[in-house]
Amino acid sequence: LLVHDRPIRRHADDSIVRIVAGREQVLRRARGYAPLPIAIRRAAPPLLAVGGHLKNTVALARGGEVFLSQHIGDLETPEARRAQEAAADDLARLLAVEPRRVACDLHPDYASTRFAHGRGLPVAEVQHHAAHAWACLAENDLEPPALAVCWDGAGWGPDGTVWGGEFLAVDAEDCRRMGTLRTFPLPGGEAAMREGRRAALGLLWEMLGPRLFDQSALAPVRNLTASERINFAAMLRRGLNSPRTSSAGRLFDAAAALLEVCSVSRFEGQAAMELEFAARRAGPPPPAYPFRCVRSGGAAAELDWRPTFAALLAEHAAAQSPAIPAARFHATLAAMIVAMAQREGRERVLLTGGCFQNRLLLELAIAGLRRAGFRPYWHQRVPPGDGGLALGQAVAVARQANGEEGDGCASASRVKS
């Protein structure tokens, strides 16, 4: 055998594509797709967009096109960060374009944000969920107005809190937060991304307060050690390392833990995936659980999931299998989307963010919106998750920059509350 470990000059993973609602949907855009351009409605100045921290891609905008790089991955390691820099430089050389500004996420601690600020160019910070919305709008070749349903695990909100269950009214130049999921605390912060039981405890605290630790029939409580009970009670009571979040992704994790489907994930998205698999065993979609939609003054409407989880827990206590409660949970989230679309009254509804990698949720939402007379749009050529952020960042800045030079785009596409 003649072998040689040749260095990889330009890495490119295999692309991942599936069929959703009869159409192709790209989940990982790499070999065979990148760096093919996405056409955009407004010409962009020479611009580099550096994406987010997870599932990173970068993009180079030139005129009426945005060239999206191959999937780079999570920027947790020095090797990944060097790959991001190489991908950005490769695009500039390939297209013979010298970027004159950089777009990045609003999160101050992302490696991609630090990379953007280190380029020595004017920087435009684009709010995470606004970038999701603009990406979905652009790849579907649409113009505002639209309602964007932006559901994912986490994104830095302009108010400094952790967003993730957002409804944005997308207009010609900006986005407005017109609805959100009710927030709840996440004991342990980022640890809750791996341990759905933490999300479940935070959710139960929001529903029951200190009484949650008396609910030994519930798996997330029953399986706590004595020291864990003390520590979690102190964290939640005093708000220590327990940031509040509106994340739809963490609702999936909490539901999976409460239904005893998955309490601790071995890989990203495991809890939500197992919950979807359990729901598919239920057969035809059952009816949704109750929920409330509350609006106070001029603030964004709030979808209150507490009636949903009260009903889910009651049904789970009497059920032989998690299948029906899991299916009804999915149906409820789809019903929430339709309810908010009806409140806002915008015909076009964009379904974007990592939660819409869940095919059951996506197809239920599409069907429900169509029955209610709306026109749903979702990602097909660009991933619905953070792999599409760079496209959205480029589009947001292109819409606000209007081809002007200088650093006046420093606050591009902040979301208005």
Q: Where is each model-derived feature located?
A:
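A contiguous, well-structured pocket-lining segment that forms one wall/lid of small-molecule binding clefts
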Residues: G52-D90, W205-E347, L360-A367
